[in-house]
């Protein structure tokens, strides 16, 4: 995961996406709703469309076996930073699932 965030934060988003499984799923919670994206095209597109200056700063990583729980700070130009509870599932070296929920 360290490599994923390093690539993402250095603007190498295409390379960061190569760390995802083709069938990756991502759930983004906003308020009482959740949106699920499936496949590297949809999930990767979410990261590629994000603001160019977006940074995701991980902290307090907790290894739960296949899942990694992370306190994540998201910074975007001109917008107040946001703290998220993030869970990443990694199988065979590939990210297979991502879950973002506001704190």
Please identify what each model-predicted range represents.
Residues 38-81, 85:
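Surface-exposed, charged secondary-structure patches
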Residues 20, 74-76, 102:
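Short beta-strand segments enriched in hydrophobic/aromatic residues
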Residues 81-103:
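Short beta-strand edge/turn micro-motifs at domain boundaries
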Residues 25-35:
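A short gly/proline-enriched turn/hairpin at secondary-structure junctions
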Residues 11-27:
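Short, well-ordered alpha-helical segments enriched in acidic and aromatic residues
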Residues 26, 61-63, 100:
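Hydrophobic/anchoring residues in structured secondary elements
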